[in-house]
Amino acid sequence: MIFLIFSFLLFFTAIVEKKIIFKISFFIILFFFCMTYGFGYDWINYRYAYYHSLDPGFIPFFAEPGYFYLMKVGLFSGLSFGVFSSIVTLFIYSSIYFFCIKLENRCLALFSLFSFLSIYILNEWIRQGLAVAFILFSLIQLNKGNKGGFITLVLIAGLFHISALVSLSYYYMHGTSYGKIKNKKGFIFLTIFVFIVLFSLYNPTLVNFIPIIGEKLFDYGSILEGAGVGFWEYVLTSKVVFAYFFMLCFIYLLYRQDKVDGSALLPMYMLFLSRLTQALIRIGYYFVPALVLSMDGRFIKERTGLKTSLNKLVYMTSVLMISCIPAWNDAIWYGSQTHLTIFSNSNEINIEISRKCKVINKYNEHHTIDTCRW
């Protein structure tokens, strides 16, 4: 899969850590993904919504207005869905570029962001990809001390995916020592929050009355109930949970070693908690930029090349392991083997949709791709 190939290549660029290598590798990835789309499945739903976005009375399958109005502008301008997707991808990767160039370890930052986000956020869950793009721009403003700009950009991100509002917690994290008492309250709050979500998922009828959020929890809970998999069975048998737990333990050991810098603990803890249930996976991804920022500070004085420290190599190997997670999911793995380009014609697109439907229907009976259920 192309995503794993790029992750492995970026792994080695992070060892070398040269500005020119960062630019070359970034623009190669940018060019490839701006020319292609259709790696997963969600694009099928989005493509249908795109070509019906100007129809009177048409209601999209998502509630947030940001992406829908972008669709309207794109279709009104006469853009094909492929070209529209290319422009959206360009914006998302531009946010990654401007975020990374503000850091000391640019190659490491690009490698980390791509490994955590590539297949899901940057290609499959495109609305959340746009939300993350605005979050990256908001962090640039926050680091400049422009708190108003930070809040404004987070609110704009919420127009594309409501879950982005969780990024307002960055305001709380910024400039604090994560090992102090104040941050211990953050750990307690996150633990209680996740416990409430888990309780709601396994008792969905209790929260169904809550607008939007309750309905989503009810839907996720119904899927869990239909699958017949209990919480502990899922946690103890999940390779994904193990991978995130391993990385959390490693970062905790780094914190114990440094005695001071524990800034990566909270975002990594949230990433781990988010993997305990499907309902929180999307929320967890918003903490990846905070983790990347923290690890950039941790390795700011580290040597590169053949003198790269063991700690940095272990961290990078852990991130590389995270990038392999899509390979553990048959639906994602086989669904991302083929793709389209912005030059694909209608016949090629229809063939690809048919191919995707065969895969998703085989591996996921609870999928939400409407075209594949007709």
Feature locations, PLM:
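Alpha-helical transmembrane segments and terminal signal-anchor/GPI-anchor hydrophobic tails
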Residues: F39, I44-Y48, S53-D55, E64, ...
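Membrane-interface transmembrane helices that cradle and orient dolichyl/undecaprenyl
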Residues: I135-G149
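Signature aromatic-anchored transmembrane alpha helix within multi-pass, membrane-resident enzymes
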Residues: F189-T191, T304-C324
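Membrane-interface alpha helices of multi-pass inner-membrane proteins
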Residues: S118-I119, G149-M173, P267-R275
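Loop-to-helix entry region of an early transmembrane alpha helix in multi-pass inner-membrane enzymes
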Residues: P65, S77-S94
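Transmembrane-helix signature of polytopic, membrane-embedded enzymes
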Residues: I21-K23, Y97-F116
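Membrane-embedded alpha-helical segments of multi-pass membrane proteins
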Residues: M1-L9, F27-I28, I87-F91, I126-F134, ...
